[in-house]
Amino acid sequence: MAKMLKFNEDARRALERGVNTVADAVKITLGPKGRNVVLEKSWGSPTITNDGVSIAKEIELKDKFEALGAELVKEVASKTNDVAGDGTTTATVLAQAMIQEGLKNVAAGANPILMRNGIAKATDKAVEQIRNASRKLSSKEDIAHVASISANNEEIGNIIAEAMDKVGEDGVITVEDSKTLETYVEFTEGMQFDRGYISPYFVTNTEKMEAEMKEPYILITDRKISAVKSIVPILEKVAQAGKPLVIIAEDVEGEALSTLVLNKLRGTLESVAVKAPGFGDRRKEMLRDIAILTGGTVISEEIGLTLEDISINDLGQADLVRVAKEDTIIVGGKGEPTAIKERIAQIKAQIENTSSDYEKETLQERLAKLSGGVAVIKAGAATETELKEKKHRIEDALSATRAAVEEGIVAGGGVTLLRAKKAVEEFANTLSGDEKIGAQLVAKSLDAPVKQIIRNAGLEPAIIIEKIIEKDDSKYGYDVLKERYVNMFESGIIDPTKVTRSALQNAASIASMLLTTEVLVAEEPKEEKGPEMPATPDMY
């Protein structure tokens, strides 16, 4: 395949056109008075969104060189989304401002490599200022404010705050479709996994079709149980203790299953058998989680334990185990709190070290189950289009809220970046030559988000920004919704520190890469051939 090449200034200008196309489409959504963008879908109804990364991903340009610039901006948005879950539009606006300012300097003869060094140093200085301005979340109201701003909706903010308050920092919160028009939150207490009873004969509540075991012993094994003789000794010990028994095993079948059912029907021993959750190594880890939560031991030949040898001390215990047809919930596991804490710390370390999204998701799920909380936000709306948009906003707000819990919050509305500008300008003056130019372009770009927020509200930025800077108070800013100067924290106009920091760092990274680009290489577009003419028959 033949390639096309572009060099020097031509290359950079083509990239800039691509950057501007994406950034101009994205930046109109910034702030509480930002507009929406309608995205055409090849199937189903169109999507209406104000989420920067969703809009950026949909844009594909015909010109191959401009498309390269567009891809770089998409990278800014998606990287910020991956790290912080929000701030994609802010990152895009910052990147565009840095690139436009940087290209002017490169065209005027500045050395891009030295400029890049200046950009990196100035970004570190700005991040330091952002961290200094950060404060920890102090209340449920703070969480609600962060979520409300990200979702642009107070009701969603309160629902997320309620969910996070119940499940805690390590709990899992998922978003599903509601069967009604209402948006609400459902909680699952304790550890839940998606395996139910092996036989309906174990049911104790025929109305709900559930087996409910109060203060049971829990036998946990990775083996298949089919011979009754292997479990008779432990069944006798549990029956003598006068408590019910829950068996979690790879499978329970044959005479072992019929003995358990028969004992249950005769009233000799209340019991229920459940298949172990997960598969392979994941199953082993989940069984260990259950064992640690309940204070039991996983009966496995790997550690030299057989079913015949176990004592009642090897069994786990809980306040309540509720088993339905398709899921099981263990409430109030009686494991050692220190052992549970150690297991949680171990899973957290694994989450930090894994690069696989799927692996991360399953580990977070296990973490939540051990921490004892799963919340499901049921999103309701009148139409499919509105539902899609609402779910998207809830997911974004959840990510932003987690980021806020992790690193704290700063004044929102672009004010924190604006206030970092002065320190970065002073720092730039300590540098020299083209490094200084690189640092200065970072300083100049720091007011781009606040300007865009004010413009999107139909107001003039210059006067408002001047008045904000006049007052030397990091909490002081402008509420574009109410059109007045306020204490940003008291008014609930706050952003997660992680979001603001990530947006700036990712924008600076992409701007540096683009400014140091000299050559573009792209594939030549294929010529589309028209349909061939059918052969005409010979004329005689």
From Swiss-Prot:
Which family, according to UniProt?
Answer: Belongs to the chaperonin (HSP60) family.
Cite the Pfam families for this sequence.
Answer: Cpn60_TCP1
Q: Which NCBIfam families match?
A: GroEL (TIGR02348), PRK00013.1 (NF000592), PRK12849.1 (NF009487), PRK12850.1 (NF009488), PRK12851.1 (NF009489)
Positions in coiled-coil regions: none
In its UniProt entry, the species of origin is given as Petrotoga mobilis (strain DSM 10674 / SJ95)
Listed InterPro entries = Chaperonin_Cpn60_CS, Cpn60/GroEL, Cpn60/GroEL/TCP-1, GroEL-like_apical_dom_sf, GROEL-like_equatorial_sf, TCP-1-like_intermed_sf
**Enzyme Commission number:** 5.6.1.7
The source's superkingdom equals Bacteria
Record keywords, A-Z: ATP-binding, Chaperone, Cytoplasm, Isomerase, Nucleotide-binding
The molecular function terms in GO held by this entry are:
ATP binding; ATP-dependent protein folding chaperone; isomerase activity; unfolded protein binding
What is the stated purpose of this protein?
Answer: Together with its co-chaperonin GroES, plays an essential role in assisting protein folding. The GroEL-GroES system forms a nano-cage that allows encapsulation of the non-native substrate proteins and provides a physical environment optimized to promote and accelerate protein folding.
| PROSITE patterns assigned | CHAPERONINS_CPN60
- For the protein in the UniProt heading, the enzyme class is isomerase
Kindly indicate whether the keyword Chaperone belongs to this entry.
Answer: yes
Q: Name the predominant localization.
A: cytoplasm
Protein name according to UniProt: Chaperonin GroEL
